[in-house]
Amino acid sequence: MKTKLILLYGGKSAEHEVSLQTAFSVINALDLEKFEAEPIYITNEGEWVQGPLLTGKLDFVEQLRFSATNTVKLAATESEKSEGEAISPAVLEADDQETVVFPLLHGPNGEDGTVQGLFEVLNIPYVGNGVLASSAAMDKIVMKKIFADAGIPQVPAVAVRLIDWKNYQEEMVSEMEEVLTYPVFVKPANLGSSVGISKATNKKELEDAMTEAFLYDRRVVVEQGVVAREIEMGVLGNDTPVCSVPGEILPEGAVATFYDYKAKYQDNNTALIIPTEVDPEILEQMKEYAVQAFLGLDASGLVRADFFLTDDNQLFLNEVNTMPGFTPYSMYPLLWQETGLPYSALIERLVDLAKERHAAKNALKYKLED
């Protein structure tokens, strides 16, 4: 019997369009001899719309943007709209057919533990990280505390709340300028894909960057900028994770002063070097920190660990991403491609890991013996 794979994408998030790109890529890579693919689109307003079962490859991304109607069909041309049925999330409950949810969601309400909590309540297996790892890794402030507790090196940073910024802006700026030196990077605490992130090289730019970041979150983290190589590593597994080869990001020219949203998803000038050259000792340290971060978060399925490596071989873990970009041209799948695990096989491995974790959870006792 085929595994029913529910593909959940879109979402009420600034990363809605990224999620659509990811879903399009995964769906077109699925072996439909092994999977029954069922798309569920979450609109920008948060409405869940179920599309038709997929019997072949999609032609364009817009086919996945369903409008809730009384009919269910895929658009045949880009000028048409795909149609689906408005549903309640409760329909995700597993039936007699083996069912796995693949949440292809980025950002808040997708990779922050909220939708993962729904899957746990429904007791349905799902790809990727659980509630704890998803929520902790989504919050850059909490994540930094976990890494610090594990002894993983990070760049200096200052956390700022909106209420404190409103009431004590001058004092907060002074504190940041005492702890950090320009340039700094200002980031919303709970957002991914570099949305809302700005680089500041002076006080005026810092204040403008804070204003921008607070549009996306009420908590912001300000990090010390470093001149360093940006090297990333994929981690895959459950209790015994393994690491991929390392890859390096090279935004070219003046297009990007850091690896921002445009460089990640819109800019063809961004170069990815996979595998990249790293001293053997540094590479082993990188793997150790990546696994420590994975286990410290109680992660499962997949994580991408992002590092800074300076010219004098100082290594800093910048962050981990529990649902990294997942198109065939994104860093995480490419890392595994070069490690020997092609895109389609990676998807199947993640589904298997979801089943393994779900079986292990259901084998636990949840009732005291009399």
UniProtKB/Swiss-Prot annotation:
Cellular compartments per GO CC: cytosol
Positions with a binding annotation for ATP: 177-232
Pfam families named among the record's database cross-references: Dala_Dala_lig_C, Dala_Dala_lig_N
Positions bound to Mg(2+) 1: D306, E319
Residues annotated to bind Mg(2+) 2: E319, N321
GO MF term (any one): metal ion binding
Main subcellular location of this protein, as a coarse class: cytoplasm
UniProt subcellular location: Cytoplasm
Catalytic activity: 2 D-alanine + ATP = D-alanyl-D-alanine + ADP + phosphate + H(+)
Keyword Cytoplasm: yes
EC id: 6.3.2.4
GO BP of this protein: cell wall organization; peptidoglycan biosynthetic process; regulation of cell shape
Disulfide bridge positions per record: none
Keywords assigned by UniProt, alphabetized: ATP-binding, Cell shape, Cell wall biogenesis/degradation, Cytoplasm, Ligase, Magnesium, Manganese, Metal-binding, Nucleotide-binding, Peptidoglycan synthesis
Class of the enzyme per the UniProt entry, highest EC level: ligase
Family listed: Belongs to the D-alanine--D-alanine ligase family.
This protein's name: D-alanine--D-alanine ligase
